[in-house]
């Protein structure tokens, strides 16, 4: 069976059009913002509040103001949680045994993609990888790694975490 492009297989114009299409696609797929922008730095700081302060140190009062009222958390192992369920799980599970499990951002993996409506910034997608450490007595061992994707929405000039996908959890083999 012949491809519909068979008559054009030797066409110079077709090769140019394909090259242009590949170039344009690469621009779109690499549209993350520079790490020196205010948006990148702001959302990296928000990530730090979520994990360094709330997850690692159990300062949950730092977390509540940045979580949207209609927040949803999707976890590949623990299921779906709304805002109330997520905060309760943080309190009872993560902070129920403080210092046992901690999270570290894989800094080089963090990417931020702005979301705009007619040129006006309304949100951003933040994604990356993180590792999880377990503390036994004085030994700290990296035990897991996972991917995350966060949807941030700008509400009244304040960034709110609206959706989180936490997935690809697996044992760390580093």
Language model regions located:
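Bacterial Sec-dependent N-terminal signal peptides
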Residues: 1-37
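Short, low-complexity N-terminal intrinsically disordered segments enriched in polar/charged residues
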Residues: 21, 29-69
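A short acidic/glycine-rich loop-to-helix N-cap element
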Residues: 32-34, 137-143, 171-174
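A solvent-exposed, acidic/Ser-Thr-rich amphipathic alpha-helical stretch
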Residues: 40-41, 59-129, 142
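Short beta-strand segments enriched in hydrophobic/aromatic residues
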Residues: 67, 130-132, 165-168
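Beta-strand elements of well-folded, non-transmembrane domains
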Residues: 130-136, 152
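Short beta-strand edge/turn micro-motifs at domain boundaries
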Residues: 143-172
